[in-house]
Regions:
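PEST-like low-complexity, intrinsically disordered acidic/proline/serine-rich tracts
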Residues: 4-169
Length: 169
């Protein structure tokens, strides 16, 4: 999937309200263990002993992605959406701020914006590509599709979150 130069808009085609407290639906979501499992030996290029030692020493790109993209294993997220940005508190985890447009964040080049009604965040670094798509299935159900390219392997993960109803509603 050639995602270079994603055509992302500064606003969705119609109002999309992502703000709120969202709790993961484990049953409906993909299994994280399958996502983080090393690729089967036959799919991974054969490495010499030295290369294998170096790979282990460097740590896997996927492990780095899981650490840096806490949406992958957050149990709950709190989203504060503005016109041109979004803040996401990951529980457990840290706070992440995303501004629409093109930005550099640490080692990442981040493109964020809208495709129709979906919020898309595309992050690239050396040998790593992460595509996140936030999609409201209905006003109280959020689907998150992740495509991760790391360690020469493509992985996909889909997670579902339900909006927490405010007390007394």
């Amino acid at each position: 999937a050639g995602c270079q130069g994603l055509d992302l808009a500064q606003a969705p085609v119609a109002a999309v309200q992502l703000s709120g407290v969202w709790t993961v639906d484990e049953e409906a979501s993909d299994d994280l263990r399958a996502f983080t499992r090393p690729p089967s030996e036959r799919r991974r290029p054969k490495l010499s002993v030295q290369e294998e030692i170096r790979r282990i020493g460097l740590g896997s790109g996927l492990a780095f992605v899981v650490q840096d993209f806490q949406i992958i294993d957050a149990q709950q997220i709190v989203i504060e959406q503005d016109r041109d940005s979004m803040g996401v508190k990951h529980i457990p985890g840290t706070y992440r701020d995303v501004t629409w447009g093109d930005r550099e964040r640490d080692i990442w080049r981040v493109q964020a914006g809208w495709q129709e009604m979906d919020l898309v965040i595309f992050s690239t670094a050396k040998g790593l590509r992460i595509l996140e798509r936030y999609q409201l299935v209905n006003p109280n159900r959020l689907r998150l599709d992740l495509e991760v390219q790391a360690d020469g392997v493509n992985r996909k993960l889909t997670r579902f979150f339900d909006r927490k109803r405010r007390a007394g509603r």
